[in-house]
Amino acid sequence: MVKIEKKLHKPLWLKIKLPSSDYKIKVIKKTMNKSSLYTICEEACCPNLAECFNNGTATFMILGNICTRRCPFCNVAHGRPLIPDIHEPEKLAETITNMGLRYVVITSVNRDDLYDGGAQHFVDCIRAIRAKNSATRIEVLVPDFRGHMKTALEILNTSPPDVFNHNIENVPRLYRHIRPGADYHRSLKLLKKFKEYNPSLPTKSGLMMGLGETREEIIEVMRDLRQHNVTMLTLGQYLQPSSNHLPVQRYITPQEFNEMKLESLAMGFTYAACGPFVRSSYHADLQNKGIEVK
């Protein structure tokens, strides 16, 4: 449990405007429950849930809803996960067909208990989706495959996604505090290796800001990402899911986010989404088209 010394007052630009009707939100939730599928939107208490669900979109979370790690910023449950559902790829593909989605994002919990970190399940989902929805573009947001990277990449390369995303999350100085069990350089290596195997595919990574990092440290991480051939970047404001999670150290202004976007584009990123509510999967379809998201 994280002890909070002082809670910062949330600025006006972080006030969320809720949709006038929650009908579509209820429909999405009912669809997920009926298919026994999970969304990271719900499990992580994403601030954009109402907007995305109201627009008929969601980020699917495969391999269960229990993570093998316990990161103090994350709201996803942790513990001993269940055996992967072998029917999940087919259920996922069917749901995507029924929802009429043309761009989907698939993520997962960490599965350090599996020999491949869950890579084969990702591939099974990609293949099932493409079999039913050949025109649907697929973005994956993967864990770091700790201890299984070589095996995981070999498996993913048999059916690569259209966009490969792995979030670096924050700066190396804070990793032990923010991402226990993760390694900054391992995450960079994963992104670089996938790009080496698939040079024509976009690689993407994102960071949360407001956890105690400095602007200079964020800039340095951006440089590291470019040096490892990452082409797309997302920067967003960290928001505390509950009083049991890491507190916000600072709220970044919209102007600062705009400045960071200019910095990133000057470094050579082909696309950058930088803003208070930006998450790596937030309007991912628009991000992939190069349309501004913030």
UniProtKB/Swiss-Prot annotation:
Q: Does the keyword Cytoplasm apply?
A: yes
Q: In which pathway does it act?
A: Protein modification; protein lipoylation via endogenous pathway; protein N(6)-(lipoyl)lysine from octanoyl-[acyl-carrier-protein]: step 2/2
Q: Which domain of life is it from?
A: Bacteria
Asked if the record carries the keyword Cytoplasm, the reply is: yes
The record's catalysed reaction(s) read:
[[Fe-S] cluster scaffold protein carrying a second [4Fe-4S](2+) cluster] + N(6)-octanoyl-L-lysyl-[protein] + 2 oxidized [2Fe-2S]-[ferredoxin] + 2 S-adenosyl-L-methionine + 4 H(+) = [[Fe-S] cluster scaffold protein] + N(6)-[(R)-dihydrolipoyl]-L-lysyl-[protein] + 4 Fe(3+) + 2 hydrogen sulfide + 2 5'-deoxyadenosine + 2 L-methionine + 2 reduced [2Fe-2S]-[ferredoxin]
EC number of the protein: 2.8.1.8
Keyword terms: 4Fe-4S, Cytoplasm, Iron, Iron-sulfur, Metal-binding, S-adenosyl-L-methionine, Transferase
GO MF entries? 4 iron, 4 sulfur cluster binding; lipoate synthase activity; metal ion binding
The UniProt entry lists the main location of this chain as cytoplasm
Q: Where is the Radical SAM core domain?
A: 53-270
Q: Which cofactor does it need?
A: [4Fe-4S] cluster
Quote the InterPro entries the UniProt record gives: Aldolase_TIM, Elp3/MiaA/NifB-like_rSAM, Lipoyl_synth, rSAM
Question: Could you say which residues bind [4Fe-4S] cluster 1 here?
Answer: 41, 46, 52, 281
**Which Pfam families does this one have?**
Radical_SAM
Family statement drawn from the similarity comment of this UniProt entry: Belongs to the radical SAM superfamily. Lipoyl synthase family.
Give the protein's recorded name. Lipoyl synthase
- What species is given as this protein's source? Baumannia cicadellinicola subsp. Homalodisca coagulata
Organism lineage string = Bacteria, Pseudomonadati, Pseudomonadota, Gammaproteobacteria, Candidatus Palibaumannia
